[in-house]
């Protein structure tokens, strides 16, 4: 199998979907490829990186950590997602950390090249605007669930949001999600999440597979 060129990789990133071949070729000479091992930080909360990171493969989590090292997981990122654009736009430090869950390959675009791309390609600016709006909506949704739902409802929402269609009534959570990770997403203790998951299993709402993924009876797992 032929090795993919930088131009081939750029075409796979949604933010560059509106670029011409000539623009892709120009951009390909100004990005670098980098590999992060599992558990490495791509960007760190409170710091500046001065670059845009475009995820090609792998998975990373967006999280906030307080002075007591308590972590809250805000989002999970995968292929096609961008990291660091907010800091590049407003010049401030990163509002959250992004750490890899598995080995993750990224393309790195410098601040200068990012600004040039924004100025010359309106499609990139529009894509970023849409992406930021989606993140804002997701943040509002998260605040709403924390304020208005009990722990059972918040855990159910995390599972449903992460699920992929499978059959007519079931949905499968493709990636392994530990009780600790779910606890960090819903603002509860690991013990409480374990109790909720056990109740869901006893009531037939979910089934845990040997590999750690879940099968959901989504029509029965009603948000509370």
Question: Residue locations for each model-derived region?
Answer:
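Short aromatic/basic micro-patch
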Residues: 18, 52, 76, 108, ...
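Cyclic nucleotide-binding regulatory module and flanking cytosolic helices
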Residues: 1-38, 83, 87-88, 120
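Phosphate-/nucleic-acid-contacting segments
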Residues: 151, 158-224
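Long cytosolic regulatory regions associated with cyclic-nucleotide signaling
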Residues: 1-6, 21-24, 86-87, 128-131, ...
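Cyclic-nucleotide recognition modules
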Residues: 23, 74-137
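Conserved phosphate/pyrophosphate-binding and hydrolysis machinery centered on Walker-type P-loop NTPases
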Residues: 42, 48, 145-152, 172-175
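Short helix-to-loop capping/linker segments positioned immediately adjacent to catalytic or ligand/cofactor-binding
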Residues: 96, 115-119, 138-148, 166-169
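Cyclic nucleotide-binding regulatory domains
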Residues: 15, 40-102
